[in-house]
C-alpha cells in the first residue's frame, strides 16, 4: 500500500479515466439545444415601444405591456423592468421608439409633442386649431407680447357678474378706536 498523498501511476480515479477516454471524441448532441446566453440571462417581455427615460411613467406604462404597478407611499413603482443600456437610452431624441412601424397608436404616442410645449393663443381660432397647426413661439419677445395681450384681455372683462356689481371694502376700518 502506498503512503498517503503518494499516488501509484497505475491507479487513477474513475473521473480521470472518463475524462481521458472522452478527450478526443465529440460529445453527442443533446435532445434539446442549449438556450442562448441572452435567453438564459433575461426574460423577454412584450412591449410596444422603448422609452427614452424610465422616469417618464406615462411612457413606461404605455410601452411595457406586462408591468405590475404597485402603489407605494411616495410614488407608483413599476416592477418587472430591467435596466436597459444607458447609451441607448440617452441616444433616443424622441420620447420613445416603437417596436412595430405599423402601430399607429404607438406612433402617435411616441412622436407627438408634449402638451406643455404647445402655446394656445386667444383669437379667432379655437385652441384645437392652434394646437394642430403646430404653432410654437420661438422668440421670447413674441411670447411676451402674446402674454401681455392675454393679461390685457383679462383686465377688460369682469371675472364674474357678481363681482362686477359688488363694491370693494376699504382696507382700513371706518371707525377709529379711542
UniProtKB/Swiss-Prot annotation:
Its main location: secreted. The keyword Signal applies. Residues 96-111 are annotated as: Endothelin-like. Coiled coil: none annotated. GO terms for molecular function: endothelin B receptor binding; hormone activity. PROSITE patterns: ENDOTHELIN (PS00270). Residues 156-178 are annotated as: Disordered. SMART domains: END. One of its GO terms (cellular component) is extracellular space. Disulfide bonds join 49-63, 51-59. Residues 1-24 form the signal peptide. Endothelins are endothelium-derived vasoconstrictor peptides. This is Endothelin-2. It comes from Canis lupus familiaris (Dog). The gene is EDN2.
